Design a protein with these regions (language model features):
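Aromatic- and acid-rich polysaccharide-binding/catalytic face
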Residues: 115, 121, 151, 189-228, ...
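Substrate-binding cleft of secreted/luminal carbohydrate-active enzymes
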Residues: 58, 260-323
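Active-site clefts of carbohydrate-active enzymes
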Residues: 211-219, 238-269, 294, 298, ...
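Alpha-helical transmembrane segments of integral membrane proteins
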Residues: 353-530
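Aromatic-lined carbohydrate-recognition surfaces of secreted/lumenal glycan-active proteins
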Residues: 123, 177-195, 242-249, 285-295
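Conserved, mostly hydrophobic/aromatic
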Residues: 60, 97, 153, 207, ...
Length: 530
């Protein structure tokens, strides 16, 4: 079909027979597809339990922030009632907790004692000597005041990784603390930094290493993650004997972007944690799991993935990571209902299809549109952090609704208000396509230039790409050509840096290929119309 701003509809006569068979078949197919999509994502998986009412785990990282709090918001007041409730909950499954700072945590040892918990207390070491001195003094005070609760202390967390202190400065701080307390003293960092700075090891009483396969320079997928952890732990055990080794952080994220073969999900988090606990207890390793609760504030600096390492969510609800069946999307029936309602609304909006072929395509379009909007809305709830990100995501959802409305009316027997609405939408078809191309260019550039913490928004642009690839619209020739070239030029670099083992990146690249094809076809429509 040719043309850029108008389209001649093939109107089915009012007396013609409704194409019931193809329409019903397509509706059934769309229904099954939506059910299969959401059930496939959310189906429960049964794994061997890591924790039981009679078997507690060793230790978990604990930061006492509520879901609306962040250490970046100063001054900040910690909530004693929150800490009290947290410790009561964690005492059901853990023997000890690890903390990272002593600021405003003077009462934490008393609360821990009340609930039968031990503590590994950390002092936050930073590039500011005055702040570090306050932390060290507080650490010594807490350790000496509560020797029955504080079983070890950690002087600094990944300070060498952040390059905030030198190894020599760190050793001085460690020796300073060792001279004033009786508990064992250690320093905690990613395992590579112990190898890069061997001069720190003689100063500590035991070695504390962080093993996070997801964050490795060469990320390990869930299938190989435990093997990698075991190899590093064995290497350190042999290299530093007779000093003990504490795995100070290990875990897996439940949400966020894929890194090579490492895929964040609730099921993968449960697989890793349960498998690791079994392996650690079989080998007699000391360990601390990261972390007790999801920390939304970490998304500011680490993207969506940073906020979802908890064994419980930010509302202190069990994520089923330690025991019981686990689902990647526990509320999948809700998303299924939303998608079905959206698909039904699209069918009602379109009304009577204009031909038997349209009767087959219309329900499928409605299902694809409902799936894309639902998937992107679910992603938005996970990734959006600021007002600007919420507005951007909201604009993309509105754009998808407009494109779905346009596409549905393309297949409709239009009369009355449907004809008027279609004419308004179709006369602006070039605008909807250009806006889709602009969004694609912005997100593609971000994923090429600053990809580390960004998720792949494939669902946001798949519907516009498909609709305008199948039914091209002309207009804005110069802008469309520029957007097509820009997106197309970024596809190969984006895939190269993500590697072909990243199926999320491949999905985004394929979406962009479809979008570029739609943009390119619109240029041909313009040329034909001229």
């Amino acid at each position: 079909m040719r043309g850029s701003t108008t389209i001649r509809a093939r109107i089915m006569p009012a007396t013609s027979r409704f194409p019931t068979a193809p329409f019903a078949f397509a509706c059934l197919l769309g229904l099954l597809a939506l059910f299969g999509l959401w059930y496939g994502i959310g189906q429960p998986v049964t794994l061997a339990d890591a924790a039981t009412p009679t078997h507690k785990l060793q230790c978990a990282s604990y930061t006492p922030f509520d879901k609306d709090q962040s250490p970046f918001d100063q001054p900040m007041q910690l909530r004693p009632e929150r800490m009290e409730a947290d410790l009561a909950l964690l005492a059901e499954r853990f023997e000890c907790l690890r903390t990272y700072s002593v600021t405003d945590l003077e009462e934490l040892p008393n609360m821990a004692r009340k609930h039968g918990l031990k503590l590994i207390v950390g002092a936050w070491v930073s590039r500011n000597p005055a702040d570090t001195a306050v932390e060290i003094a507080g650490l010594v005070k807490i350790a000496n005041a509560h020797p029955d609760v504080v079983q070890a202390v950690i002087v600094g967390n990944e300070a060498l990784l952040r390059k905030e202190v030198t190894p020599q400065q760190l050793v001085v701080l460690i020796e300073q603390v060792k001279a004033q307390i009786k508990q064992p003293v250690t320093y905690a960092d990613v395992w590579e930094f112990w190898l890069k700075h061997p001069e720190v090891a003689p100063a500590v009483d035991f070695i504390t290493i962080h093993l996070l396969p997801y964050w490795e320079d060469n990320p390990a997928g869930i299938e190989n993650a435990l093997h990698e952890v075991a190899e590093v732990r064995q290497t350190f055990g042999n290299a530093y004997a007779p000093k003990d080794i504490l795995i100070g952080e290990t875990g897996w994220p439940s949400e966020g972007r894929q890194r090579e073969t490492a895929v964040p999900s609730l099921v993968n988090q449960a697989k890793f944690i349960r498998g690791f606990v079994a392996m650690a207890e079989q080998n007699g390793w000391r360990y601390n799991l990261i972390e007790a609760f999801d920390q939304p504030w970490k998304r500011v600096s680490e993207g969506a993935v940073g906020g979802y390492w908890g064994l419980y969510d930010a509302d202190r609800q069990d994520k089923s990571i330690l025991a019981g069946p686990v689902s990647n999307l526990p509320h999948w029936p809700t998303w299924l209902m939303i998608s079905l309602a959206l698909a039904a609304a699209a069918l009602l909006w379109a009304g009577r299809p204009h031909s038997p072929r349209a009767a087959l395509l219309l329900p499928l379009l409605a299902a694809v549109g409902a799936a894309c909007i639902g998937l992107f809305a679910e992603l938005t709830l996970v990734t959006s952090r600021y007002v600007g990100e919420w507005l951007w995501a909201g604009a993309l959802i509105v754009l998808n609704l407009v494109v779905l409305s346009h596409g549905a009316l393309l297949l409709s027997s239009r009369n009355g208000w449907r004809a008027r609405t279609f004419n308004w939408l179709h006369s602006r078809g070039a605008l909807w396509l250009t806006l889709s191309g602009f969004a694609g260019a912005v997100m593609m550039l971000a994923l090429v230039v600053d990809a580390r913490y960004r998720s792949f928004p494939s669902a946001a642009l798949l519907l516009p790409a498909l609709v305008y690839l199948c039914r091209p619209v002309g207009g804005y020739r110069r802008e469309v050509a520029l957007l097509a070239l820009l997106i197309g030029a970024c596809i190969a670099p984006q895939l190269y840096q993500e590697t072909l083992s990243n199926w999320q990146a491949i999905g985004w690249a394929m979406t962009c290929v479809l979008l570029v094809a739609a943009l390119w076809r619109s240029l041909r429509v313009k040329a034909q119309a001229a």
